[in-house]
UniProtKB/Swiss-Prot annotation:
Binding-site positions, ATP: 646-654, 672
Record-stated family: Belongs to the protein kinase superfamily. Tyr protein kinase family. Fibroblast growth factor receptor subfamily.
Compositionally biased residues, Basic and acidic residues: 234-257
GO cellular component, one term: receptor complex
Protein name: Myoblast growth factor receptor egl-15
Record-linked Gene3D superfamilies: Immunoglobulins, Phosphorylase Kinase, domain 1, Transferase(Phosphotransferase) domain 1
Leader sequence segment: 1-19
Composition-biased stretches (Polar residues): 1022-1040
């Protein structure tokens, strides 16, 4: 243990470190089989009962096999009596029916796979029915006659208070067959009853087969007992004794189909001094657990990690046998009641099982036992927490440096978070020969010099759960130094340390006598104060004078402008843009056209008419702007009818509308329009997007422009309607186990909010979503981007939120508010102050504000990652100021859960740092088309095409990319495989729309910046982008 601690401590000083256990790697340890349930390994059963041996294992990627043994000998299929023993290899269970004496002993199972094996033993003990009446509390008059006869003919006088001499062959004759079945061992002889037999004449036993089920006799009689008399059955009729039987217990002799122990109860005992008495076979009583009070008897709390099986027991007694009803949070549970994720509740006879429990299964459960006499309840408080398969986490800021005086007490606190049971110790790091570490020749590594604090007499260590406290009493200068808290479990170890500083006693000089009187105000102080007051007065007078002059000039200028005129009309003119000599765009506008605002004066009469029209309609402040009409795309306003709003942003709205193309043809469309609070800049942006739609043309995977409403009145841009909303929300709707992220109205930005499905438009989900569907989505987007690239259009904002899902799940690329036409240059340089989505931006765009088609390829790789994670948020654990530095150092996102190897290769090739090494959209379309058309066997066998595609883009130097390391470990996954998300999702959903971050993130390397309120991490402006330093050394790369 000490050597292992020293090896772990040798990693580093004054920082949290982790150390993995030596021996099995985590890869092997996680794949060793483990049992799913905690099984009962000892069974005490009666003859004729049934047993189920459970060796089921938890879900794993590695197939496991089970073998069954009887007394350490393998049970082969040809040696098994199939009528008695049945194997269930799928559920890894063994069913043993019709228990007889020969089944008593050891049964075991062994589960194994390629990584290891586990075993479980079961002990079976057959309890004789008559052994129950050996308890001294049961009066001898209540013992069934068949048991007395069995003990007599088996020559086992097990009860000394029974008069065996009074038991005759006539009384025992009707129990002959039952006596054989009840025997723990075969009787040495079969009793012979009748006049022709002697009293104890016997016939040798020749053969004993497997005992069958005891005969069920429906005739149940009453018994009349006399004081101190033997048991003699008295019949109500003259029926043959063999046709009736005496029953003293309420024993259910039918086969128990449940996996729980059967209840047996006896009638009320008869006192020895009782007279002639009639006994009832059973007595009605209400359900109860430990008492007969119909009140809440139990209130249990069950807390366990996710993935375990939760079992709530509600074993109740009573007659008639109670019926159990389960409730969760006050609602009755049925077999049709659904759990989170599509799982079902498992109802046993006396218990409720919740397999693979998740956090959503937490809540208040209670069971109610009912019969016709009464009821009883039992309550359970269930808490399910997520598992953490990792070494312990030492909570930061708990263990802090201490500074105390000599002879005082120093106290250090350490708190650990761990799913597994952690082990915590305290050590002191010693400095020997000027160094805290030394080189261990046998281990060939540096280790710390340390001493465990348990060996110190004046140190006390106290553990309470996951918290530990180190207390050092009567500290001295020798105790000054570094103390560390070490915590470990089966997955590794973590360390945190703090420094203890001991203060010596210092001499304090105290002044005595009266304090001298000193004049605090000197002549220079008076002069300085006077000058300051004069300057403040002068500044105040100057400010008042400035405001008065400004108001006067403003009023004069307004009067001059309104002489004969009251307003100006502004026309939005779109014309061809003249090219500069350097053939480079000079601002943010697209190159083929330019948008200008031309003002023309209007008369008072025309201005008054416009003012009345504005007040009586939906026109906004922008009503004085008129956009030149385009006859090719113009749509009459009278043919549009707005239905309801689909989405909105800070200055824009998207409405669902109906467009009447002809008298008899009416279609549903989407209309983009500006809000009343919009300004001139937003109008120009909407006009720019409209012109981009006109330049692009039509393609199946690009949102189609239907027309626009220009001229006098608000500007409407009419596009086709995609009823399933955007791709991000469509994919998140297929997530079965998590809440969909909702966006509050306070998080709206200047961008138009992506359309989200409302109650009026239900998303048509794909019933069985497979990897082929996801690759099909990626192929459609690549086709649309290939079309835009052929048109020399740079999208600049390619993301899942800007891809819409139409009829038949056809994807449409939309939102061209940031798109630019680069017919002349093949690139575009950003010079304005617009906002940009940095999570989807390429390195060259973050570094130099340069955008090319290859920049869209980078964004396509991020969108592909969103598709494979069903709408996950990229870089959820990296703060935005650190993103650029991490990307420059070679970091790329890890492969999504169960992502095919070929798809992740494609992502990594899109994230190449050099532009020329990224594939074109034409190459991406061909590659995805190859994946969709080839069969699974062909994909695995056609590595030549796959290797050639990626080898052409491999770099000659630099760190190993995630693609190369992933290629060595990942296996091919067929596209027909279902998309199985883990019970606890690996890819977080964070809100993608945030405002500009104005607060620097806290200096905490362990903090996960996912939807952090202190860090707005989606969109930045060029001013705030300067906070991303270009020097890689100044940024700390987080650990992954």
């Amino acid at each position: 243990m000490s050597y292992f601690l020293a090896s772990c401590l040798g990693v580093g000083l004054l920082s949290t470190v982790s150390c993995s256990l030596q021996g099995l790697t985590s890869h092997y340890r996680e794949n060793i089989p483990r049992f799913k349930h905690v099984a009962n390994e000892r069974y005490e059963v009666f003859l004729g009962d049934e047993i189920k041996f459970d060796c089921q294992t938890a879900a794993s990627k590695i197939s496991a096999f089970v073998e069954w043994y009887r007394n350490d000998k393998l049970l082969k299929n040809d040696q098994i009596d199939k009528d008695k023993i049945r194997k269930d290899n799928n559920r890894m269970m063994l069913h043993l029916k019709n228990i007889d004496v020969s089944d008593q002993g050891l049964w075991s199972c062994r589960v194994h796979n390629a990584y290891g094996q586990i075993s479980r033993n079961f002990t079976v003990e057959v309890i004789d029915f008559c052994d129950y009446f050996l308890f001294p509390d049961i009066h001898h008059l209540n013992i069934p006659m068949e048991c007395v006869c069995l003990w007599k003919y088996n020559k086992e006088a097990k009860r000394s208070d029974v008069n065996y001499a009074a038991v005759t062959g006539e009384v025992c004759s009707k129990y002959a067959s039952r006596m054989i079945n009840r025997a723990r061992k075969p009787l040495p002889m079969i009793p012979c009853f009748g006049d022709h037999c002697k009293e104890f004449d016997t016939t040798p036993v020749s053969d004993f087969g497997l005992p069958g089920k005891p005969e069920d006799d429906p005739l149940v009689k009453r018994v009349v007992l006399k004081k101190d008399d033997v048991i003699v059955p008295v019949h109500d009729s003259e029926e043959s004794p063999s046709e009736s039987r005496t029953e003293f217990i309420n024993a259910d002799e039918k086969e128990n189909k449940e996996d729980e122990e059967e209840d047996y109860s006896v009638s009320q005992p008869v006192a020895p001094d009782a007279g002639l008495t009639e006994l009832n076979i059973t007595a009605e009583e209400p359900p109860y657990f430990k008492s007969n009070d119909n009140i809440v008897l139990f209130n249990e709390t069950h807390a366990l990690p996710a993935g375990r099986t939760l079992k709530l027991n509600c074993r109740a007694k009573g007659y008639p046998e109670p019926q159990i009803i389960w409730y969760k949070n006050g609602k009755m549970l049925k077999k049709s009641s659904a759990r989170s994720g599509g799982y079902e509740f498992k109802f046993n006879r006396w218990s409720l099982e919740v397999e693979d429990a998740v956090v959503a299964d937490s809540g208040e459960f209670h069971c109610e036992a009912l019969n016709k006499v009464g009821s009883a309840k039992k309550y359970f408080h269930v808490i399910i927490v997520n598992r953490m398969r990792r070494p312990p986490i030492i909570v930061p800021n708990i263990l802090a440096n201490q500074s105390v005086n000599i002879n005082d007490t120093a106290t250090f606190h350490c708190k650990v978070v761990s799913d597994l049971l952690p082990h915590i110790i305290w050590v002191r790091i010693n400095k020997i020969n000027g160094s805290y570490s030394y080189y261990n020749n046998s281990a060939e590594e540096y280790m710390f010099n340390y001493t465990e604090m348990d060996t110190f007499d004046k140190a006390h260590v106290h553990h309470v759960g996951d918290e530990s406290t180190l207390t050092i009493f009567n500290v001295s200068l020798d105790d000054q130094g570094i103390y560390a808290c070490l915590s470990g479990n089966s997955l590794g170890m973590s360390m945190a340390n703090a420094t203890l500083t001991v203060n010596e006693f210092m001499a304090i000089h105290l002044l005595t006598g009266d304090e001298p009187k000193i004049d605090r105000w000197t002549t220079s102080d008076y002069i300085f104060t006077t000058i300051l007051l004069f300057l403040l007065l002068a500044a105040t007078l100057f400010g008042i004078l400035f405001m008065v002059c400004k108001q006067t000039l403003h009023k004069k200028g307004f009067m001059d402008d309104t002489v004969g005129l009251v307003a100006r009309k502004k026309r939005v003119v779109v014309s061809k843009r003249p090219m500069n000599e350097d053939n480079e765009n000079s601002d943010d506008e697209p190159s083929p056209y330019q948008i200008q605002i031309i003002e023309t004066p209007i008369t008072k009469k025309e201005a008054a008419r416009k003012q009345r029209k504005r007040m009586n309609s939906e026109n906004t402040v922008l009503s004085e702007y008129e956009v030149d009409s385009d006859p090719v795309w113009e749509v009459e306003r009278s043919k549009l009818s707005l239905v309801h709003m689909l989405g909105e942003g800070a200055f824009g709205e998207v409405w669902k509308a109906t467009y009447k193309e002809t008298e008899n043809n009416e279609i549903a469309v989407a209309v983009k329009k500006l809000k009343m609070s919009a300004h001139e800049k937003e109008l120009i942006d909407l006009v720019s997007e409209m012109e981009t739609f006109k330049v692009i043309g039509e393609h199946e995977n690009v949102l189609r422009l239907i027309g626009c409403c220009t001229g006098a009145g608000p500007l409407y841009v009419v596009v086709e309607l995609c009823k399933h909303g955007n791709l991000r929300d469509f994919l998140r709707a297929h997530r079965p186990k998590e809440e969909k992220a909702k966006k509050s109205s306070q998080e709206l930005t200047d961008y138009l909010e992506p359309r989200k499905a409302s109650d009026k438009d239900d998303i048509e989900l794909i019933p069985n979503l497979t990897q082929r569907h996801l690759v099909q989505f990626a192929w459609q987007v690549a086709q649309g981007m290939n079309f835009l690239a052929s048109k020399k259009i740079i999208h600049r904002d390619l993301a899942a939120r800007n891809v819409l899902v139409g009829d038949g799940h056809v994807l449409k690329i939309s939102d061209f508010g940031l798109s630019r036409d680069v017919h002349c240059n093949d690139y575009y340089r950003k010079r304005g102050n617009g906002r940009l989505p940095i999570k989807w931006m390429a390195l060259e765009a973050l570094d130099s504000n340069v955008y090319t088609v290859e920049s869209d390829v980078w964004s396509y790789g991020v969108l592909l990652w969103e598709i494979m994670t069903l709408g996950g948020t990229p870089y959820p654990t990296i703060a935005m100021p650190e993103l650029y530095a991490n990307l420059k150092e070679g970091y790329r996102m890890e492969p999504p859960h169960l992502c095919p190897q070929e798809v992740y290769h494609l992502m990594c090739s899109c994230w190449r740092e050099k532009l020329e090494e990224r594939p074109s959209f034409k190459t991406i379309v061909d590659y995805l088309d190859w994946m969709l058309t080839m069969t699974n066997e062909t994909i695995e066998g056609s590595q030549e095409f796959n290797d050639q595609f990626f080898s052409e883009r491999s770099t000659a130097s630099g760190p190993v990319s995630p693609m190369e390391s992933f290629q060595k470990k990942r296996k091919h996954r067929p596209l027909s495989a279902p998309v199985n998300l883990p019970s606890e999702p690996q890819h977080t959903i964070c809100d993608d729309y945030e405002s500009n971050f104005s607060v620097e993130p806290p200096n905490d390397p362990n903090h996960l910046y996912c939807n952090d309120n202190m860090l707005k991490n989606h969109i930045i402006t060029p001013e705030t982008s300067q906070r991303i330093p270009s020097n890689n050394n100044s940024m700390s790369k987080p650990e992954f």
